[in-house]
A protein has these predicted regions:
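Conserved N-terminal phosphate-binding loop of PLP-dependent enzymes in the Aspartate aminotransferase
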Residues: 1-183
Length: 183
């Protein structure tokens, strides 16, 4: 919820799904909870044909109360708006600048607080950077105090939605230094 700077990533592109599933993010992972949101059209099918669901562990009061509280706090504290602002003012510009400074950065893509920096051996062919060098970038970040999510040849920047602009900028600077050390 809110990671891209909108409640759901699909909101950025005007997508109107028939069904959305969700889980731990709805209550910040405090208590296991998942759910489904359906369109009015899909919901209408149950007007005359009941859904044979509703098991003994459904509708758990503690889990749903924690979700209501988490969503209320996210709304009141404008967490989603903050994620959008972080992407627009700090993460996006900072990470995109890495393209100009490091030949091993082949692409930077993202929105809000959900970014990926693609590491390449060659920008033209997009040949992935060797795993050992990707690991060296990760290790450089960890040594400086940031634990990035690394998948294949991508360094993902997915900070907490409540991170400050200064701390987000520090994370970008740590990645910048780690990239410089590797090449």
């Amino acid at each position: 919820f809110g990671r891209t700077g909108a409640w759901f990533a699909l909101d950025h592109w005007g997508v109107r799904p028939d069904l959305i599933t969700f889980a731990k993010g709805v209550n910040s992972g405090y208590v296991p909870l998942g759910g489904v949101v359906i369109s009015d059209e899909i919901a209408a099918t149950f007007d005359h044909t009941p859904f044979p669901g509703g098991l003994t562990y459904s509708g758990h009061a503690l889990a749903t109360a924690s979700a209501v509280a988490a969503l209320r706090i996210m709304t009141e504290e404008k967490v989603v708006e903050h994620a959008a602002e972080l992407g627009e003012r700090t993460l996006g510009p900072g990470l995109r600048a890495l393209l100009d400074r490091h030949e091993i950065v082949g692409d930077v893509r993202g929105i809000g607080c959900f970014w990926a920096v693609e590491l390449v051996a060659d920008r033209d062919s997009k040949e992935p950077l060797a795993p050992g060098k990707v690991e060296a970038v990760r290790a450089g970040c960890v040594e400086a105090g940031m634990w990035p999510l690394v998948a294949a040849n991508r360094v993902h920047m997915v900070p907490p939605l409540v991170i400050s602009h200064d701390d987000a900028a520090d994370g970008v600077a740590i990645l910048d230094r780690a990239l410089a050390e590797v090449g």
